[in-house]
Structures are given as C-alpha cells and as structure tokens.
C-alpha cells in the first residue's frame, strides 16, 4: 500500500500519530483495501467525528462491500453526509447492515446510477428491496428538519413505473410525520411520455 499525491508521486506511508493541527482533508480515494488501510483510517477517527463525509462506493466485488461494512462503515457512519452507490455495493451493504441508511444521522443525499426505483413500499427489514429501504430513509425525518435528496436512474417498464408512482403518492398520504425530501430521477427515453403531474 502507498499514499500518492494528486500528481501521481508516491509518498512514504506515515508511521507517526497524526499531528493535532490536522483538522480535515479534501479527499481520500481508496482503490485497494486491506487491514493496513483500515489501520491507517482508524488514525483519522478524530477527524471523521467532526467532518462531513461524502462517500462513494462503486464496486462489483461482493467481498469488498463486506469488508467495508465490517471495518470502515462503523468509523464513518455518524459523519456520512452523502453516499453514492451502485446496485451491487448497495445490496451487499444492506445484507450486512439492513438499516444502513437510517443508521446515518447526518445522511442527506443518496445517489445510484442504477435503477433502484422499482417500488415505493416503506420497509427497513433485511428482506426489504433497495427501493423500500430508500423509502424508509426518506420518510424518516431528520432531527434538524433539513430535506433529504435521492437520485437514481429509472429503466423500469411503463406499467411498473406507474405502479411505483402510485405507491409514492400513497406513502405521502399515509405519512405519520411531516418530512421534506426531493427525488431526482433520470428517466429512460421510453418513460419520458409516461410522466404525469404528481397530484
């Protein structure tokens, strides 16, 4: 493992404790992960506790997702402000931590370039679909009242799309507490003509 500057030059891996004057970082990009990386990240726990973290997990490797949940997620969870996931990573993370979204008190933005907007029944159990877990997170109010954002692509057939929108309307009608959120959908060309006013 090595640390590399943005210009590609490797830096020595630090062995000493982090200096107290270090109060944050702009970006940490991890391409390879093992216990050495986890040990290095643990030295940043003080900073993770005071920073807003924008986390991106794009992997097709199930074992990497499992490693992230077991070793890195507990360190970052309370400070994650936004998370970008692909379907494989999201599904595996949720298998290991079904309530991963609602367990992040600072989380305001969830994005996936994959289609996980297939049904809008609110559920947070281990057996819930990815979309049901997102629905549960969206309808769980933040303590500060700030709105949440969810963004994904939609490639569903038109009839499934209509059913999902009806479920979303019903969820709004049945909400037990006021919530504010935005949903941004990137529709496939076949669905553009299916868009109708929400109410």
Protein language model annotation of sequence segments:
Residues 1-199:
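The conserved beta-strand core of Leucine-Rich Repeat
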